[in-house]
Swiss-Prot record:
Keywords: Developmental protein, Disulfide bond, Extracellular matrix, Glycoprotein, Lipoprotein, Secreted, Wnt signaling pathway. PROSITE patterns: WNT1. InterPro entries: Wnt, Wnt7, Wnt_CS. It comes from Xenopus laevis. It is found in: Secreted, Extracellular space, Extracellular matrix; Secreted. SMART domains: WNT1 (SM00097). This is Protein Wnt-7a.
């Protein structure tokens, strides 16, 4: 919730508040954590009904229904490491990666355990002091 005060010279004679979403980065972390803990489910049909009546977690001997806060999926995600024309995935072969990064752009994760080739580049740049031009 965010609030803003209204009044003469900064006095808070009237206060207006409204509900806001969390910061985008925080929301991204929440969704990523949910994705890591997502549970596979399967639809269960009632004996007389043709439509699925509820979802249950897909594990042997498990009859627990997912909680309202669970992120659920019915089919597993495709393997994004390999090229798959059916899903439109180009795979990760030949992609540039960051050897020192620990997240998704890091070579260990992006190259899917296939290894990677390293190249070292050297560039010479002319230094330019910004925003000052002496007479």
């Amino acid at each position: 919730q965010e609030c803003k005060c209204h009044g003469v010279s900064g006095s808070c004679t009237t206060k207006t508040c409204w509900t806001t979403l969390p910061k985008f980065r925080e929301l991204g972390f929440i969704v990523k954590d949910k994705y890591k803990e997502a549970v596979q489910v399967e639809p269960v049909r009632a004996s007389r009904n043709k439509r699925p009546t509820f979802l249950k977690i897909k594990k042997p001997l498990s009859y627990r229904k997912p909680m309202d806060t669970d992120l659920v999926y019915i089919e597993k995600s495709p393997n994004y490491c390999e090229e798959d024309p059916m899903t439109g995935s180009m795979g990760t072969q030949g992609r540039l990666c960051n050897k020192t990064a620990q997240h998704t752009s890091g070579c260990d994760l992006m190259c899917c355990g296939r290894g990677y080739n390293t190249h070292q580049y050297s560039r010479v740049w002319q230094f330019h002091w910004c925003c000052c031009n002496c007479k």
